[in-house]
């Protein structure tokens, strides 16, 4: 009789581990867990399930196609209705797309009445940072008060041309300017805060290290500036007219002198030709030259001098005879 050498406790532990372990298809295939017949039956069942799944999918696809067809037809009808209503909607939305068409291009003058002129103040800028435009200046000073007008004096055109010719910056620069604030207290505040101070802002800014040079013009209004500019323009115009008149007079005098020189040269050439014709011999040529010279000079003098007509002399007061004087004395 054979003895059982296997440990029952160990066998029981193995069975519990197998029961607790989950299903793994890859391990069964490696170990040959199922027979060929079992696999064949499972394959047939899986094929049948695949066919049924395909039929269900075809059925669902047909239903979805029908739903999509109906949705497409409804979308087409909606598109036609939108196309019919489209022009009306575009016309209705046009004012909303262009909100600023009716606004005027020019800014309104805020200092028009006498009271507004009295309240306004003008600030003078003796130096404008290089290549700073009026829009940039307005953006820098606008936070300190409401600005009405700005005028900047442009640089000399010859200086700009020279700089561009030498390879410098082509931008326009300004030398000085005037800024009109709506309220004079804002103008005074700007001068007190910013005068002799750096412009500041971002360090990458072009004008970060430039210094403000502002001065409040007490009692100065904008119309004074326009009068000064008009006076300067009138003075420049009169100066240009005087220069043009002077140049024209000099040109006329030059042309007159040229014509006179031509006339004198023609007279002298004709006199020389006459002298050559009248010369028959060397002696006669010498005498002829002397005579021709005197004739030429006399002809030139005749051309240059004008004989004046003598005026009639006034009659001298004749003395009356003695008997006439005696008779006249008795009468008067």
UniProtKB/Swiss-Prot annotation:
Residues 43-59 have a biased composition (Acidic residues). Pfam families: RRM_1. Transmembrane segments: none annotated. Residues 1-100, 269-302 are annotated as: Disordered. Its main location: nucleus. GO terms for molecular function: RNA binding. Keywords: Nucleus, Ribosome biogenesis, RNA-binding, rRNA processing. One of its GO terms (biological process) is endonucleolytic cleavage in ITS1 to separate SSU-rRNA from 5.8S rRNA and LSU-rRNA from tricistronic rRNA transcript (SSU-rRNA, 5.8S rRNA, LSU-rRNA). InterPro entries: ABT1/Esf2 (IPR039119), ABT1/ESF2_RRM (IPR034353), Nucleotide-bd_a/b_plait_sf (IPR012677), RBD_domain_sf (IPR035979), RRM_dom (IPR000504). Residues 121-211 form the RRM domain. Belongs to the ESF2/ABP1 family. Involved in the small subunit (SSU) processome assembly and function, and in the 18S rRNA synthesis. Required for the early cleavages at sites A0, A1 and A2. This is Pre-rRNA-processing protein ESF2. It comes from Chaetomium globosum (strain ATCC 6205 / CBS 148.51 / DSM 1962 / NBRC 6347 / NRRL 1970) (Soil fungus).
């Amino acid at each position: 009789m054979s003895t059982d050498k296997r440990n029952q406790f160990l066998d029981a532990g193995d069975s519990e581990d197998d029961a607790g372990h989950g299903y793994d298809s890859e391990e069964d295939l490696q170990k040959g867990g199922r027979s060929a017949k079992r696999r064949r039956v499972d394959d047939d069942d899986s094929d049948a399930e695949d066919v049924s799944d395909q039929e269900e999918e075809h059925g669902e696809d047909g239903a979805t196609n029908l739903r999509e067809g109906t949705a497409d037809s409804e979308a087409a009808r909606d598109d036609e209705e939108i196309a019919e209503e489209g022009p009306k909607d575009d016309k209705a939305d046009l004012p909303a797309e262009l909100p600023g068409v009716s606004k005027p291009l020019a800014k309104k003058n805020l200092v028009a009445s006498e009271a507004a002129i009295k309240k306004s103040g003008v600030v003078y800028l003796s130096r404008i940072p290089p290549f700073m435009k009026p829009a940039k200046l307005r953006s820098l000073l606008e936070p300190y008060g409401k600005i009405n007008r700005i005028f900047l004096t442009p640089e000399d055109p010859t200086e700009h041309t020279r700089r561009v010719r030498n390879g410098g910056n082509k931008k326009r620069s300004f030398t000085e300017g005037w800024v009109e604030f709506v309220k004079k207290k804002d103008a005074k505040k700007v001068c007190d805060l910013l005068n002799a101070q750096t412009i500041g802002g971002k360090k990458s800014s072009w004008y970060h290290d430039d210094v403000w040079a502002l001065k409040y013009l007490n009692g100065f209004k904008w119309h004074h500036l326009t009068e000064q500019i008009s006076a300067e323009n009138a003075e420049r115009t009169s100066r240009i007219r005087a220069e043009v008149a002077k140049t024209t007079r000099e040109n006329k005098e030059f042309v007159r002198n040229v014509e006179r020189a031509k006339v004198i040269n023609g007279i002298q050439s004709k006199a020389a030709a006459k002298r050559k014709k009248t010369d028959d011999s060397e002696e006669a040529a010498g005498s002829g030259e002397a005579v021709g010279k005197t004739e030429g000079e006399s002809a030139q003098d005749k051309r240059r001098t004008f004989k004046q007509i003598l005026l009639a002399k006034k009659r001298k007061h004749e003395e009356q005879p003695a008997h006439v004087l005696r008779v006249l004395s008795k009468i008067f």
